[in-house]
Amino acid sequence: MALKRIGLQTVELPLRPAISASAAYVGRKEGEGPLGALFDHVAQDELYGQETFELAEKRLYLDAIRKAIQKGGLQPENVQFLLGGDLLNQIITASFSARELGIPFIGLYGACSTMAESLCLGGMLLDGEHASTAVCAASSHFCTAERQYRYPLEFGSQRPPTAQWTVTGAGAALLCLEPSVPPLAHIARICMGRVVDLGVSDANNMGA
């Protein structure tokens, strides 16, 4: 059996699954940045019309997925897999969103690599002809991530100048073997990374 591998970490996808559509829903701070005009929607407050930050993140996640599917000319029932995750315990944003969407779900936790991981695995699913459609998604929310990894906002801790600012937003991409709209790109190869410990232990200076 010929393996679809190139070197140690790269896999070739001969069927070249298409990224037929994508969507991004973000918070106000992200909308004020240089990419602001490119997002599908910018929420004007951190709660996004919800009662908690966690519910706000879930709404961003669902909206991004539904928008990507719509832009790809499909309905949720036409999507055969949802691959995605977030930064919270039990990947609750992705899990509860999957429950609402009813799409077969593969939950992923790769922290900052979750979106790329979902595209790699989704591409392999389609190239292996185990599915013809899949949606890949990832999200985070500044207020939920601060509670998870640093200090809850209500604690009032002072942030050092080097502290990272976790994105409030969700992104989704629809993969298809036979897209019904002109594709944005094709996944021809994927390269899986390795874990490299650089010895950075300061949670407030992760870019050191």
What are these regions (language model features)?
Residues Y109-C136, L175:
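Active-site-proximal alpha-helical scaffold in enzymes
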Residues P14-P17, E30, L55-D63, E77, ...:
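Conserved active-site and cofactor/substrate-binding residues in soluble primary-metabolism enzymes
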Residues I91-I92, F142-R147, R194-G199:
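Short, well-ordered, mixed-charge alpha-helical segments that flank or form enzyme active sites
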Residues S20, G84-G85, A134-S140:
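Short beta-strand segments
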